[in-house]
Amino acid sequence: MPATEYQRSFGRSFLNLRRDTAVNSVESTTVTPELTQMEAELVSFQRKVAERFIDLNASSCEDLLSLEWVGKLLDSFLSCQEEFRSIVINHRSMITKPPMDRLVSDYFERSVKALDVCNAIRDGVEQIRQWQKLIEIVICAFNNNGGGSSGKRPLGEGQFRRARKTLIELAIGMLDEKDSSSSSVSSQHRNRSFGRNKEQLHHRTIGHFRSLSWSVSRSWSASKQLQAIGNNLATPRASDITATNGLIVPVYTMTTVLLFVMWALVAAIPCQDRGLQVHFNVPRNYQWGGSLMSLHDRIIEESKKRERKNTCGLLKEIHQFEKTSRLMNELVDSVQFPLSEEKEMEVRERVEELGKLQEALKNGLDPFERKVREVFHRIVRSRTEGLDTVGKHHGSE
């Protein structure tokens, strides 16, 4: 259904509920210019959320779950969060009254649980960087052969031994990431968070810090954290909508968006106890519901593909990483010496392919990590502002 039809559908259902309440209940709130303006804001919020998810859902299969696409998803969350923040601020007089004060506080408490997901995703980014370093060793093993600018010397057995050893280490590392208890890295206590003061970390070397310092405990579970975020999340009933003058709708919308974004991050990036068993069931009369459910189904279908079933992350670049390194490993294992000219050319072509993938990852991970960090800090700031608004009101009573 086109976004305009969703908009009209939601607008009619919401306004009809408001008008029916005004007619049928002598105790109903008088329809004031403030309420009329608020209704327009709520419908506008639904439309903007829908536009974001329609755009995300329009991405091709090749683009879905790429670093660029996941970054776009985070941009969408930040945009929705800012719109939601405006609604909370503009209508604080209603937000601070029961039951809205409880509902808004509940959303912000759920958002706190998303902070651990952000930190776990940051850990996953660092894990991918460790894989990059191993790929660099493989590339250097074949490129650093003293050929100089005049030409390249034939590849020797020593280079293949070094590459083979590194590729095996890479394969084991990627397998270990699926089971955090078997990973030597995860045996270290995880203690890093986006919220920590950089000055406190100044004395750690980058290499040591990245390989041994983490942000969530060994017992932490991404699957359980997602379940906690979505626990008891229910679609607002008609009576709830009228009782809150419709303000429950953006709270439900923002909570669902938060849950979906965190779920998609866990699906894409390596982290502890990844699990996609989160229930989404958004009614179609929500403008954004169709697109969000379609994206959910597409990601689930991607996870069911034969070549993706045992992956440590559905990120497109991880899939390319796994595929390319596996092919390289098979090629290295198949060579016989003396090396034929044809086989050497094939090896060099594969090394060049690894180099391009390495460069793409290098250029994509930093911007992605910055966006995850921005989401983390935006959640913290929004929660502080929101709870402060509710707290100040109750304190003045």
From Swiss-Prot:
Its main location: membrane. Disruption phenotype: No visible phenotype. It is a single-pass membrane protein. Pfam families: ROH1-like. The chain crosses the membrane at residues 247-267. The keyword Secreted does not apply. It is found in: Membrane; Cytoplasm, Cytosol. One of its GO terms (biological process) is pollen development. InterPro entries: ROH1-like. GO terms for cellular component: cytosol; membrane. Mostly expressed in mature pollen. The keyword Glycosyltransferase does not apply. Involved in the regulation of plant growth, and modulates pollen development to ensure male fertility. May also affect the composition of the inner seed coat mucilage layer. 'Roh' means corner in Czech. Interacts with EXO70C2. This is Protein ROH1D. It comes from Arabidopsis thaliana. The gene is ROH1D.
